[in-house]
Amino acid sequence: MRSRSNSGVRLDGYARLVQQTILCYQNPVTGLLSASHEQKDAWVRDNIYSILAVWGLGMAYRKNADRDEDKAKAYELEQNVVKLMRGLLQCMMRQVDKVEKFKYTQSTKDSLHAKYNTATCSTVVGDDQWGHLQVDATSLFLLFLAQMTASGLRIIFTLDEVAFIQNLVFYIEAAYKVADYGMWERGDKTNQGIPELNASSVGMAKAALEAIDELDLFGAHGGRKSVIHVLPDEVEHCQSILFSMLPRASTSKEIDAGLLSIISFPAFAVEDANLVNVTKSEIISKLQGRYGCCRFLRDGYKTPREDPNRLHYDPAELKLFENIECEWPVFWTYFIIDGIFNGDALQVQEYQEALEGILIRGKDGIRLVPELYAIPPNKVDEEYKNPHTVDRVPLGKLPHLWGQSLYILSSLLAEGFLATGEIDPLNRRFSTSVKPDVVVQVTVLAENSHIKELLRKHGVDVQSIADIYPIRVQPGRILSHIYAKLGRNKNMKLSGRPYRHIGVLGTSKLYVIRNQIFTFTPQFTDQHHFYLALDNEMIVEMLRIELAYLCTCWRMTGRPTLTFPITHTMLTNDGSDIHSAVLSTIRKLEDGYFGGARVQLGNLSEFLTTSFYTYLTFLDPDCDEKLFDDASEGSFSPDSDSDLGGYLEETYNQVTESQDELDKYINHLLQSTYSKCHLPPLCKKMEDHNVFSAIHSTRDILSMMAKAKGLEVPFAPMTLPTKALSVHRKSLNLVDSPQPLLKRILKRLHWPKDERGDVDCEKLVEQLKDCCTLQDQADILYILYVLKGPSWDTALSGQHGVTVHNLLSELYGKAGLNQEWGLIRYISGLLRKKVEVLAEACADLLSHQKQLTVGLPPEPREKTISAPLPPEELTELIYEASGEDISIAVLTQEIVVYLAMYVRAQPALFVEMLRLRIGLIIQVMATELARSLNCSGEEASESLMNLSPFDMKNLLHHILSGKEFGVERSMRPIHSSASSPAISIHEVGHTGVTKTERSGINRLRSEMKQMTRRFSADEQFFPVSQTVSSSAYSKSVRSSTPSSPTGTSSSDSGGHHISWGERQGQWLRRRRLDGAINRVPVGFYQRVWKILQKCHGLSIDGYVLPSSTTREMTPQEIKFAVHVESVLNRVSQPEYRQLLVEAIMVLTLLSDTEMESIGGIIHVDQIVQMANQLFLQEQISTGAMDTLEKDQATGICHFFYDSAPSGAYGTMTYLTRAVASHLQELLPSSGCQTQ
């Protein structure tokens, strides 16, 4: 008999440890592990972590087997793992109905349960009696299902189970926008059952999605039907959100030790090594103690001050837990494993020694990891005053299975029984490795031979869609429909993937479906859904953005292949040539670089060997599911009745005689978007007619309605000041209008009448033939829409079934070809069109911690969006907030999409912005146009609505960045029926705060430091971003800013003159922009938190921000910043809001003084008013007229709004004096004195 080797003896010791501390809790029937001998429930997350030691030990035995008994032991341990994983699978499959519901609702009530009965796999508490929604737990299951399958274990047995796992992928793929209860099952740290977006859940979901993508769940015994598919765009969403959140854990937790699981083993979800290190150092500096790490700051769990009789905490109670949070040894096991993966022997040794010192010795000397260490009740005050000095006592479960398992696993790794690659066979540990540069393959395809010839004339040789047969080309939306079939299973009543937009990562792969190769054009080229794709310059801009996105985010083997179609809509108006923007783009693509992205232009056939392929075998003919199925819930398209069909309906029909089911299905989808031509052509004779411009009709009807109600309603609602906006605006939706009023309007507008004196709708339909412009036709259709409704059959030209809606849809297409953007937006509103990606765009902004408001302030007219909403609900909210002004509702959707583009591509634009107020942004855009065009607010509003999407996006960028911009007027072609001249936006040079202004701010710092003795001037008072240039152009457009005073000058007591004319309106504009987009100085919220600790509260516009908020929230919490923001947002005027922010910044300098308390409530409004009075007094004393123009709403002088922050007449000078005067009695004798 062979002697046992040393390694064998050591492994036997670990086997006894595993048996006595983990496997003794495993149920022999279900395989689930109970939490302890007393707690019989099985938590999903704890079970998976607890079995990892068994999995690792099984692999160690297999690798180091001395004899047959060792191989048998390895098999036994591995089957214990399989039994547990299948037990969890059984628990979840019993809740298959919840998985199906959750895909659509993402509601906490429809989530899988977090814990189950160990003996029966059944649920143990009700849906609403526990924080069940824990995306990280479900994701952890999928992650280790993938890792264990890759390691050789067979866990999934049938195709039904494969379909269920595929649906679990759909369950977690929206993790980037799902607020859940997180690792600690508490949600918001007040433990009041409030879910929140957790970085740990997003990161674990990202890891799981990446790990299980293209994995065969049957392992070596599988085929293509058992492969799981993940859409790469969903993974990238998670990556983007994770990057924006870390090192913050959630809105209520500025840091959480649970993040160790996503920055290192097991998830390795973060790709930026710097971000990993920053997060790790934050955990160590803020959470680490002598016995482990706290879970998060102010965690009351099992502390002596926690009330055991209730689960929730009162908000002000959280400060009681400061410095006495329990410390968890389990986190040190993460640090040990992290050190092993990173090859950091010092870190491994340090944490091993620390952990050995706090392990509990059990029976027979076995080492046990306790759940946590707590402060003894009689030592609480001592620890609070001197953190990390009191000896703690172990509490909770012993052993803590999660911690015990990771301790054993770390020991096996440290002793060399396991290699890191064995517990990470999918190589997630290389996530931070440098990736090779991505080259994007671009193939340009002509829609037909005519376009191909036009391109050839310019020396551009491309293939047409017919040329590349047998490769099939389809619009991206078809791929969304196809993916809706993935994961469908009749046996379990699973519908498959919900119909969702598929991003450019998904459309840049080649697909093999029924042995045919398919390529899909990106969705931004698809005119089927929204009007952005009707603007060729916008398409080119989106191509540039998407190519850069592909270069940054592509993670798959092979190169991305983007198919860019050149369609008839990309021609000039007469169809004789290619649009210049499209042609110049193709030339840039030929150069090999476009917008910073490396590209290779070529024919599709050249890219077949270097592209990435996905095999969609779930559509194979031998599959049980049929493509045409009444029960295909997932394949419903929200825009299936749209007018602009695919450009490829006929292509395949020309090259094949017989069609299989797939071809019929695709053609069915394409034909559902095709509309016939019903509208008569425009009349060429320019004679008098009874119709009028759509914009004027709207204005006249609105005006008459308002007069009938006794109201004076301005037509230009987006121009400042806000007070002029009427709450009664309902400009375009007259469906609910009283009929007598409508009759009076129609009578006055001379429409054709019938015998009874009512509008003769049949004659009105006939007048469509006499219209000379599309806007005239729109007016007629609008009146028909109001009087008869969208479903009324016009019987135009004797054809039945031609409804008002059909005609509006057709008119929308014609307006798109003519590029009449005001009309396009107007008809889009009537048709209630919505951007298909609206919900995703909104979720993107929210996930980047940017709340949204739609409509104009104040509440309740301004609606806040603080959590993702279903598309229909979101659209309805926007229309409601727009006061039924459908043009504004449509523009709001457009702005949300652009903001989402920018927050992904240029997140730096949104620094220190927490809430994006779309209504105010639109208002400021109109005001900026009025300023630049030197026109009235009404003309500016009209010009704004007529901007092309490309120019609208550029204007928004200038608003966000603070850059100066220019406006060019260009008359439309003679054949265009638009009523207003076209304008375009362009940049005017580099702009920025001048050197003098910067030095002025620095000088002001030193002045204030002298005045306050102990004031700190480390931070800048006013955020210096790019501002208005002093170019000659800028001077000319600034000479008559709509809301600015006329140019004047005055001198100070020393004879120095203030020149208002040269840079007039600059700082007013700056404050208006920053106030509208809610930008605040860096570190603003943390400074507010400090000042609140020294007073009873801040009063802003009659609302008090109490000091008690600091007892609940810590300074770095997003939740605190949002709370401050909600108080500031009660101020409806953006420039006044910004002055309040400046006043608060001056006040926060007091937080750096040694004073314990300032006293009562500080009235910030009074400080601003006092500063304004000081300013006025000095202006009058130096010879300025005593009738200096003031803002009627606030009483603030326009010159004060337009003063730079620094300098003798700067706002900061007066605000500092006002603060000193306001608080003089409370300051120490050596403090501020009014100068």
Curated annotation (Swiss-Prot):
GO terms for biological process: glycogen metabolic process. Residues 976-986, 1032-1053 have a biased composition (Low complexity). It comes from Oryctolagus cuniculus. Pfam families: Glyco_hydro_15, KPBB_C. GO terms for cellular component: phosphorylase kinase complex; plasma membrane. The gene is PHKA2. It is found in: Cell membrane. It is a lipid-anchor. Transmembrane segments: none annotated. One of its GO terms (molecular function) is calmodulin binding. Phosphorylase b kinase catalyzes the phosphorylation of serine in certain substrates, including troponin I. The alpha chain may bind calmodulin. Belongs to the phosphorylase b kinase regulatory chain family. Gene3D superfamilies: 1.50.10.10. This is Phosphorylase b kinase regulatory subunit alpha, liver isoform. Pathway: Glycan biosynthesis; glycogen metabolism.
